[in-house]
Every structure is written in C-alpha cells, then in structure tokens.
Amino acid sequence: EISSGDLNRIPAESIESFSVLKDASATAIYGNRGANGVMLVKTKHGKENTKATVNVSVEASYFQPMNTPEFADGPTFMRTYNEAQQARSATVITPRYSDEIIAATESGINPYVYPNVDWYDMIFRSGNYNQRANVNVSGGASRVTYYMSLQANHDTGLLNAADNSAFNPNINHWEYNFQNNISYKLTNTTTVNLRMMAQIGSQKGPNNKTTDIYKKVMYANPVSFPAYF
C-alpha cells in the first residue's frame, strides 16, 4: 500500500496494468480507507525461461509559460505615477518624477543613475528543459524471474542565473528511482518474492517560494535602483 505521492514515482515503463475498485468492493477489502475508491497498480514481472530483455528510453521536454505579463518601462511608469498622484490631489502638486529624470531615463544615458529595469525579464527565463531516462531489464529461468528498473529525472526552473555571478538560484532537482520484482520458486507450491522500490534525490533552489518571487516582481519599481552596481 502506497500513497499518491509514491504512486507518482513509479515509472510508467514499470506499470503492467491498473484497475479501480469503487463502492462496496473497495470498502470490503480496505474498510474506511477505501471509501473514496482504491486504485490497484500491478508492476511488471519477468517470465520464466526467457532471455534477458533490456529497454532504454530517454525523454527531453521544454516547458514555456503560455502567457506572461507585460510590464511598463521606466518612463511609462514614471509618467503614469505622476498622473495618478496628481489625480488624487485637488491642487497642483510637484510631481515625484521630473521631466528631466524621465528624459534621462528614456535616453539610457546613465543606467546606474537613471535605471530602467524589466525585473520579470531579468529574473525569469522564457522556458526550461527537463530530462528523464529509464532503463529496465527483465527475464527469467526455470525457477527465477526478475524485473529491475532504474530511472533518473532532472527538473529545472525558470529563474535566471546572472552571467557575472557564480551563484545559480535556479531550481535544480535530481531524482533516482530503483525498483525490482524478483521471484524464486522453491517448490511447486512455494514461491519467494522480493519487491523493492527505493528513491534518492537532491534539490537545490531559492529559499523563497516561487509564488513569493512572482509577487515581488509584480510590485517591483523599475526605476528605484539598477539590477547591478
């Protein structure tokens, strides 16, 4: 019996069949735990008196957001801010951003003094690549059957790494899964089964949640300070 999280870690290549038990058939076997239904997954096994068969699969995928927000540039932000500030006042007030500052920012004459930063483009990449590889072997003799599978997953994120920095804040997740089903027939009526699934992995990433990073980017001022000093 495994959880839904463990079920996600079973390689698709290792699944032979699955079925769903509902209603009385589920509760009769699993009691209250089967009240919402039970999924039975049967993993692959080797066959007697067959030669070893090796299967290898390699996948690469590219993920890209379908829609991304468009942010106002620095000059547009400053003009809009001045208009909103004036709209809230009954009298004429001195704008926060003068015409000289707006013009200097628009010209890009000195990005350190007059920054104009697209924080979304600075922090996030347009897409990310993920990889998955699986190798499994199965076979058997007159008394022994075996099936073994090894899978490696590599997932990355959308965070950019600065060209002038050795630190990479992006998500870097490696996961390795091993599974085996070994059966040994002691007698015509007795069989010993060894079934094992093991997992090991490593994950690196920012301390902040991705949603927090998105939120900070949404509220970031494009003209407050430059990205690099």
Walk through the language-model features, giving the residues of each:
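Membrane-proximal, glycine/serine-rich, low-complexity loop/turn segments characteristic
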Residues: 1, 7, 13, 19, ...
